[in-house]
């Protein structure tokens, strides 16, 4: 998948809008490490798996090429599609030559060749026709009476997505262990938390980290809500991927708790937002997307567009999610009754159409967080990254006390030469922890279903999922999905 399947980068007023519009190229500037201005010749080998996707390939290549610390490194592009891979390779080589950049680059359809000597591996794959399979994940369970809001990462749709994509990712990781066992593997593919949890259970020696940029909503929204620059705030968020909330927020100047102000002021902000359709209308009329306050003054607004579950979390749980309903609502049994279904469908149709028309290009600017993390490792910087996906018990201590050690959580982490070290968040508020705990058995059974190629365990993963409120028809639904997606799910016995 052209990654960023992790969702869609958040920006301007609507997280989903910014990710699609900017092709997931919005930089998340949180506690960003300094960019070194003197050349440090690292000569690292950085492998991009899934690089035939122009969105992922061009964006990540640009991220690497803008980094002074990594000058002298060799970039290896790998994809199973030789035609798209060749286009990305030729474009990248021409860009490097045009700008006289101190990097080398090659491409290969042979994964083992690509991984030979790798220091860092960045994975962003999808299998089959992304949108055709996604629509099956979403719509077929609905035909059997399952009420799911999106079908990408949670609920039955998230299960089938996971059952398809995890086996090839395990194959990639097995090759990493055999060929370049010391390499760091960074994953952008979804369903993030199920992928990462399964990899760490099946191949615990792999240095596997999941990255998602939904955290990028906070620098976009909180300054507008609180009236202060994001740099004036000390914010930490955590939970599971696409299922995280702001846990603490303080003003740096005096240490005051900013959450009371968030709870007071956020409803007026999110209750008067432009929908994606209205922003797209503005784009068609003006030729540009609204970004500044004066732009949004000309865009019609509505109440909580694609943020009705978000609204319940803020008003009833006192917590602000870092993403919108199409992600957060996938994991909650009551979300279907609350969510803005039209907003979700509008986003999906826009996103699908936009990706078919967008023409990505290489730019020398930072768009994602993987390169700062790599830079933090190679320079032993010790900076804090705002959101990574790592095992809850990594480094011998729990990040979130009221979740099990083995599940992969999303949390801040410090980055140094030894790797990524999760920042302890303690006990999460019990209400939010209860929602997260509902996913524990789902993730465990998903991992075991893949590892043991077990249809019975896949069925159990459905039966313990809070999105599933019925037994009747469930086995027929599972068998229907296996039949429709037999090239990818036929291994389930």
Question: Predicted segments — roles?
Answer:
Residues 80-84, 101-182:
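Rossmann-like NAD(P)-binding element
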Residues 71-91:
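NAD(P)-binding Rossmann-fold cofactor-contacting core
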Residues 46-71:
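N-terminal Rossmann-like dinucleotide-binding module
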Residues 56, 131-132, 196:
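Glycine/Thr-rich phosphate-binding loops of Rossmann-like dinucleotide-binding domains
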Residues 6-9, 41:
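Cysteine-centered motifs
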Residues 171-255:
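Internal, well-ordered domain-core segments that constitute the primary functional module
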Residues 227-493:
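Long, compositionally biased stretches enriched for glycine and/or charged residues
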């Amino acid at each position: 998948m052209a990654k960023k399947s992790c969702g869609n980068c958040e920006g301007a007023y609507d997280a989903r809008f910014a990710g699609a519009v900017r092709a997931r190229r919005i930089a998340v500037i949180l506690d960003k490490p300094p960019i070194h201005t003197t050349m440090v010749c690292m000569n690292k080998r950085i492998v991009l798996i899934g690089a035939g996707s122009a969105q992922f390939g061009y964006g990540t290549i640009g991220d690497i090429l803008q980094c002074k610390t990594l000058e002298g490194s060799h970039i290896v592009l790998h994809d199973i599609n030789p035609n798209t891979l060749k286009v990305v390779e030729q474009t990248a080589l021409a860009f490097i030559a045009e700008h006289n950049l101190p990097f080398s680059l090659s491409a290969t359809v042979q994964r083992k060749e690509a991984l030979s000597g790798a220091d860092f591996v960045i994975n962003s794959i999808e299998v089959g026709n992304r949108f055709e399979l996604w629509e099956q994940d979403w719509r077929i369970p609905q035909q059997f009476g399952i009420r799911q809001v999106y079908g990408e990462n949670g609920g039955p749709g998230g299960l089938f997505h996971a059952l398809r994509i995890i086996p090839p990712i395990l194959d990639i990781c097995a090759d990493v262990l055999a060929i370049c066992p010391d390499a760091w593997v960074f994953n952008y593919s979804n369903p993030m938390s199920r992928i990462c949890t399964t990899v760490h259970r099946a191949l615990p020696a792999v240095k596997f980290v999941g990255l998602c940029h939904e955290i990028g909503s906070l620098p976009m929204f909180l300054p507008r809500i609180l009236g202060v620059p994001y740099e004036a705030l000390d914010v930490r968020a955590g939970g599971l991927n696409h299922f995280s909330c702001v846990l603490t927020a303080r003003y740096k100047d005096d240490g005051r708790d900013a959450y009371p102000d968030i709870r007071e002021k956020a409803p007026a902000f999110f209750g008067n937002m432009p929908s994606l359709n209205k922003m797209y209308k503005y784009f068609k009329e003006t030729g540009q997307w609204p970004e500044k306050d004066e732009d949004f003054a000309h865009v019609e607004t509505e109440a909580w567009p694609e943020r009705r579950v978000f609204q319940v979390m803020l008003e009833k749980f006192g917590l602000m999610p870092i993403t919108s309903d199409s992600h957060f609502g996938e994991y909650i049994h009551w979300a279907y009754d609350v969510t803005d279904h039209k907003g979700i469908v509008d986003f999906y149709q826009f996103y699908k159409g936009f990706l078919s028309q967008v023409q990505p290009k290489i730019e020398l600017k930072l768009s994602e967080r993987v390169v700062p993390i790599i830079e933090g490792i190679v320079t032993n910087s010790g900076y804090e990254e705002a959101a990574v996906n790592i095992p809850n018990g990594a480094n011998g201590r729990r990040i979130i006390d009221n979740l099990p050690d083995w599940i992969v959580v999303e949390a801040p982490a410090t980055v140094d030469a030894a790797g990524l070290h999760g920042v302890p968040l303690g006990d999460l508020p019990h209400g939010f922890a209860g929602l997260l705990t509902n996913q524990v058995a789902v993730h465990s059974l998903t991992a075991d279903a893949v590892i043991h190629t077990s249809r019975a365990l896949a069925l159990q993963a459905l039966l313990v999922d809070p999105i599933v409120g019925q037994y009747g028809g469930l086995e027929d639904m599972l068998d229907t999905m296996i039949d429709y997606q037999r090239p990818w799910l036929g291994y389930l016995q």
